[in-house]
């Protein structure tokens, strides 16, 4: 062979088949562009150092894994389509004298040229669009936008390009193996393969119905949010499997049922459409199922992440009714590391610490109060709340999980509540789970004790941050400290060292909520310094420690906004990729079916059907499919 012949032939093939190769090059470039952006965001120190940057690292790592999976699926789908369309062309080459190794050399040059173009174009676009995505991330995180050109990550460039080059090499190897196994006659007749009428695959049909029904049953009946996290992916996988099986087997079943309906089938409008779809559905069912799943994925990802981001402020307000919470405990340990003594810091000391910290940071205290409460988890079964150690399957144990936050009626009064005048066997209940509309039981049994529900209260003055953790979450007001101590001892006997302890904290609200996370951090540092000086006025001795927990609404807002912003960015990116994949599959399906239908519709016209009737057949097929 003349030197350069195969390269010249490869360039000619790419030019003549540009309607196939151009979308493939643009598709790989687009996937590489997104992959580079997500991969680089995961490693950009400037982004990770922003407040909430740790969420970017976590969610972008997930994005990298998803992008790798989508890239493998899409690129191999495109490769299989190109090979199917060009098998006849390769057969002609073989008949004209080119050996299979020569055809593989032509494929090598085609793969090298298209891969090089895709990688260069994808990385160039990725570098340019990375700045835009960085600015978008800063905007979503409510972070300061730093002007100037962001750095080009050489490691991300190399790894991203290498990953897609490896995919192209693997695809080339698969193509060579396919060509080596095929005979020239099979290559020439490959366009006519699959013309036999398919049969209904009953096992797939039954499994598809069961999988789809099971997925929807799980999603509709699961109420516990923690259990929903465990079963969510199970439901998604079942729905995806069911969708694929029903498209493959269910579509054939429906078309055969239409064919058996003589009044419907023996009509010049319906017969060609049903018959044509029946013969082609075997190879097109998977593509249609992919379109349905990807289109659903676009809607779910974007709508879910947008809803989370829009509801971030409401989440913060629900979990942080006040601006600042402070709790502090003094601990003393033995030389062997055993806890000898533990006590809460005096409330007066904590109050003074908050006042000093607010004064230093120019904050005006609007409300400040001492809160004491006990939060206990129970298993709700047979109208009884019991303390049980969970074991075995975590999802099953969460089925009846209930959480109750207790306060005394004296504490309730001090926090602005009305006088309840509760006896020792009476309680007041507030359903704090946003999914609950009310509480209509006359009694509540906790362990072996039954309490009369004297009244329900519309608003509980304390938020422990457990609102989203259980199906049943209540705030309960008890008569006095003795009842609270009894409930504490009750759960202590079961849970032992894992039992819940009393929470004693200061809750403060400041005039105006316009401060930011920096002010919150400085407030926490100043309060911590004051408490350490109060706890250890001389010198901190070995074995002494002070555990301080301070949380501000500003820090929580920035953390929640950062988490939801990172999720929104990932949802937008993956949603666009799924949308792009849907368009790509539709495009290649249209080309594939167009070439196949051209011959069939020419035959229809030759046997006497008018152009208008052929068009009507096409419209009928489209209507049946969608």
Which residue stretches match the model-derived regions?
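Peri-transmembrane interface segments
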Residues: 19-26, 34-66, 81-84, 92-93, ...
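Long, hydrophobic alpha-helical segments
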Residues: 62-77, 580-583
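Juxtamembrane interface at the cytosolic side of transmembrane helices
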Residues: 77, 85, 178, 224, ...
């Amino acid at each position: 062979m003349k030197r350069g012949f195969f390269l010249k032939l490869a360039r000619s093939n790419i030019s003549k088949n540009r309607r196939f190769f151009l979308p493939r090059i643009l598709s790989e470039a687009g996937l590489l562009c997104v992959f580079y952006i997500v991969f680089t965001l995961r490693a950009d120190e400037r982004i990770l150092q922003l407040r909430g940057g740790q969420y970017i690292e976590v969610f972008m790592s997930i994005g990298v894994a998803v992008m790798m999976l989508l890239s493998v699926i899409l690129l191999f789908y495109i490769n299989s389509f190109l090979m199917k369309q060009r098998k006849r062309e390769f057969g002609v080459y073989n008949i004209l004298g080119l050996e299979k190794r020569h055809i593989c050399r032509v494929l090598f040059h085609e793969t090298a040229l298209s891969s090089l173009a895709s990688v260069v174009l994808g990385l160039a676009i990725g570098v340019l669009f990375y700045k835009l995505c960085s600015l978008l991330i800063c905007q979503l995180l409510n972070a300061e936008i730093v002007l100037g050109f962001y750095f080009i990550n050489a490691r991300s460039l190399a790894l991203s390009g290498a990953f897609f080059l490896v995919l192209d090499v693997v695809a080339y190897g698969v193509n060579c193996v396919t060509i080596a196994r095929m005979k020239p006659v099979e290559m020439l007749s490959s366009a006519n393969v699959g013309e036999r009428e398919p049969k209904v695959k009953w096992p797939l049909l039954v499994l598809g119905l069961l999988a789809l029904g099971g997925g929807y049953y799980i999603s509709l009946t699961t109420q516990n949010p923690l259990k929903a996290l465990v079963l969510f992916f199970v439901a998604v996988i079942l729905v995806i499997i069911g969708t694929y099986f029903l498209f493959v087997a269910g579509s054939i079943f429906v078309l055969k049922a239409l064919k058996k309906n003589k009044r419907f089938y023996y009509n010049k409008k319906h017969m060609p459409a049903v018959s044509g779809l029946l013969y082609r559905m075997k190879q097109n069912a998977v593509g249609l199922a992919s379109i349905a799943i990807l289109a659903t994925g676009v809607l779910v990802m974007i709508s879910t992440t947008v809803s989370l981001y829009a509801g971030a402020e409401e989440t913060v307000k629900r979990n942080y009714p006040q601006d600042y919470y402070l709790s502090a405990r003094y601990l003393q340990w033995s030389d062997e590391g055993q806890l000898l003594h533990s006590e809460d810091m005096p409330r007066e000391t904590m109050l003074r610490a908050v006042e000093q910290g607010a004064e230093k940071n120019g904050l005006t205290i609007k409300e400040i109060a001492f809160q004491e409460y006990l939060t206990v988890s129970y298993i709700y079964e047979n109208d009884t709340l019991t303390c049980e150690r969970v074991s075995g399957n975590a999802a099953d144990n969460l089925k009846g999980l209930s959480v109750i936050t207790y306060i005394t009626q004296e504490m309730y009064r001090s926090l602005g509540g009305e006088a309840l005048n509760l006896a020792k066997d009476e309680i007041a209940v507030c359903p704090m789970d946003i999914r609950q509309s009310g509480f209509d039981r006359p009694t509540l049994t906790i362990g072996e004790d039954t309490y009369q529900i004297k009244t329900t209260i519309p608003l509980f003055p304390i938020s422990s941050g457990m609102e989203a953790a259980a199906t049943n979450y209540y705030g309960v007001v008890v008569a006095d400290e003795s009842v609270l101590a009894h409930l504490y001892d009750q759960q202590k006997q079961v849970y032992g060292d894992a039992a819940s302890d009393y929470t004693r904290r200061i809750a403060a609200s400041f005039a105006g909520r316009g401060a930011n996370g920096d002010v919150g951090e400085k407030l926490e540092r100043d309060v911590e310094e004051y408490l350490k000086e109060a706890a250890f006025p001389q010198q901190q001795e070995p074995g002494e420690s002070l555990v301080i927990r301070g949380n501000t609404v500003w820090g929580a807002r920035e953390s929640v906004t950062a988490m939801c912003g990172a999720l929104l960015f990932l949802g937008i990116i993956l949603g666009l990729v799924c949308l792009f994949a849907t368009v790509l599959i539709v495009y290649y399906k249209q080309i594939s079916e167009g070439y196949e239908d051209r011959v069939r519709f020419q035959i229809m016209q030759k046997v006497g059907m008018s152009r208008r009737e052929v068009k009507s057949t096409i419209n009928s097929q489209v209507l049946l499919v969608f």
